């Protein structure tokens, strides 16, 4: 398609890596992770390629966080037309999803109970590497360094299990929280991405604990105004 950006082989490789990281863990890679994966001598080389991708309109770079990389939906729409000619990863189809926005969740009731739904949004599926089931409004800055900020809308796919490193929506007692998941021996740790916050350690004595879903994307709240 004519309006699809022309990328170098290395830029294509980095964009693939960003998509893969978002699909597997719910967040983009850091510059250091990109450098290590692609054999760069320093994170500065990764930053130069990311800046080039941003200039071409493929991604958006968010300052103040090591994982502040956003895939832009209009670019994904154009790249979809190439049917994997540029990218090794399959790109999502161009259908719209009606996603409910979950507000505050009452203790003991399902997260998608009708009383929790503030409203619904029509969102293009091409924005996400995997199909989400709902949006959850982020409250607080505990996941700041993963690029997840207060007021953002987290796209969540329903799930009851998680792998180490994935960003999850978890219910712990009366609270619903967004954290990075890690299982260590007999305990589960819910890790913030902000040094101002302490990890949450889940033990058999912690009370009711349940994984509600996996993060598969993020929408800035201002984009839906």
Swiss-Prot record:
Transmembrane segments: none
Extent of the signal sequence: none
DNA-binding region: 31-51
Record's keyword annotation contains Disulfide bond: no
Alphabetically ordered keywords of this record: Autocatalytic cleavage, DNA damage, DNA repair, DNA replication, DNA-binding, Hydrolase, Repressor, SOS response, Transcription, Transcription regulation
GO molecular function: DNA binding; serine-type endopeptidase activity
A Pfam family: Peptidase_S24
Marked site positions, Cleavage: 107-108
Active site: 142 (for autocatalytic cleavage activity), 179 (for autocatalytic cleavage activity)
EC number(s) given by UniProt: 3.4.21.88
One of the GO BP terms on file: proteolysis
Catalytic activity: Hydrolysis of Ala-|-Gly bond in repressor LexA
Function according to Swiss-Prot or TrEMBL: Represses a number of genes involved in the response to DNA damage (SOS response), including recA and lexA. In the presence of single-stranded DNA, RecA interacts with LexA causing an autocatalytic cleavage which disrupts the DNA-binding part of LexA, leading to derepression of the SOS regulon and eventually DNA repair.
Quaternary structure and partners: Homodimer.
Family: Belongs to the peptidase S24 family.
Protein name in UniProt: LexA repressor
């Amino acid at each position: 398609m004519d309006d699809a950006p022309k990328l170098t082989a290395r830029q294509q490789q980095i964009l693939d890596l960003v998509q893969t990281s978002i699909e597997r863990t719910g967040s983009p890679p850091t510059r250091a992770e990109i450098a290590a994966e692609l054999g760069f001598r320093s994170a500065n080389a990764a930053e130069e390629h990311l800046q080039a991708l941003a200039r071409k309109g493929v991604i958006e770079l968010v300052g103040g966080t090591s994982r502040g990389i956003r895939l832009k939906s209009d670019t994904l729409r154009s790249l979809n037309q190439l049917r994997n000619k540029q990218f090794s990863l399959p790109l999502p189809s161009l259908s719209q999803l009606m996603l409910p926005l979950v507000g505050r969740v009452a203790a003991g009731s399902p997260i998608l109970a009708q009383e929790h739904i503030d409203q619904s949004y029509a969102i293009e599926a091409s924005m996400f590497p995997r199909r989400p089931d709902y949006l959850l409004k982020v409250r607080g800055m505990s996941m700041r360094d993963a690029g997840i900020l207060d007021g953002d809308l987290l796209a969540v796919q329903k799930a009851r299990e998680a792998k180490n490193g994935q960003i999850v929506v978890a219910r712990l007692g009366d609270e619903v929280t967004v954290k990075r998941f890690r299982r260590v021996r007999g305990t589960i740790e819910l890790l913030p991405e902000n040094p101002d916050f302490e990890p949450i350690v889940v033990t058999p004595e912690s009370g009711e604990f349940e994984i509600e879903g996996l993060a598969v994307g993020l929408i800035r709240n201002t984009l839906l105004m």
